[in-house]
Amino acid sequence: NTLRWGVSGQAELISDHISEWEWRDSAGYSLPNDGQTMELYYAMRGDSSMKSARVQAYIQNEHKWNTASGQWIFTIGGRLQWWSWNNEVLPSPRASVEWLPGWKRDFCFRLATGLYYQAPFYKELRDTVTDALGITRIVLNRDLKAQRSVRVVLGGDYYFRAWGRPFKLTAEAYYKYIDRMESYTVDNVRVRYSGKNDSQGYGAGLDLKLYGELVPGADSWISFSTMVARQRPINGGAWIPSPTESRYNFSMLFQDYLPQLPQLKFHLKMLFAEGQPYYAPRNSQAWGRMPMYKRIDLGATYIFNAQTAKFMRAASAKHVKQWAIQFEVFNLVGWKNVN
């Protein structure tokens, strides 16, 4: 048996000021237009502060069991969280089993499940109310609960050799259901949360990844993922894509070096993915999808250590194992992407 445990705590002190407004102007009038006054289309104000404390603890026990069918590894444990802001206690039990079959030690299969909580941080607490003047004001929601999800992951690894080189193929299928979910929208680099447990959602997908050393000492890999992630209001309504949904993703990393100069490594990275959803301002039910994201990067890394650089063997550098200089060209082809 292997038993692990830990406890941590932190204190938080946050002060926040927000002032936003939107004015829609046209030739001779602004929107909204009543013919007499100039009105803002949207305005938000907020001055808030928060003091809170968090305590977290975890315990995990791992047991290995050898049988005629192979080696079994059972892991069971859990996390416990408490936050002074809403006085919520969050127990999170988890378990997994891993099997290394006796008939083929190059395989490994695993199954994991658990109840997970994502405790909110300050930005997620910001609820809104609209006053008589039409100004939206920030209020902190003390009744906001942690988002809760049930997850199941089934996966496996296969170790093999091809062309005289080691490879590893990893596959994982997953599903999660989320309730007490807090909806949010993404506007460029701004993430705006609703401040309420107003949604539910689910996600499911498949991840495939092949690792290999095409040249000794330099890892390369290729991966493909497909997934679906949907959410809807908790009181019903249409399922819409979650802001991070990308239904397919293909990526690759290839590394190589000169045999006469192994400390100089070159790498090529490729990424092709479906564009993520976008939404109309302050209306998440009206949405579209960005074009496909595609990029190729090329780079080089030079590693300095005691074997490759004389100055690294000096007494002044005895506490430094190695350091590196990296040069990289992003988006080598110059494709135009929407972000």
Q: What are the language-model segments listed below?
A:
Residues 272-279, 302-339:
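C-terminal beta-signal and adjacent terminal beta-strands/loops
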Residues 5-11, 76-80, 97, 111-115, ...:
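Transmembrane beta-barrel strands of outer-membrane/channel proteins
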Residues 65-69, 174-177, 196-278:
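Gram-negative outer-membrane beta-barrel transporters
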Residues 1-2, 65-72, 101-107, 161-167, ...:
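Short loop/turn motifs that connect adjacent beta-strands in outer-membrane beta-barrel proteins
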Residues 1, 9, 57-63, 95-99, ...:
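Residues on the lipid-exposed face of transmembrane beta-strands in outer-membrane beta-barrel proteins
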Residues 102, 143-202, 325-330:
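Membrane-embedded beta-barrel scaffold of Gram-negative outer-membrane proteins
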Residues 49-55, 89-91, 148-152, 175, ...:
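Residues that define the transmembrane beta-barrel architecture of outer-membrane proteins
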Residues 1-86, 170-173, 221:
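Face-selective signature of the C-terminal outer-membrane beta-barrel domain
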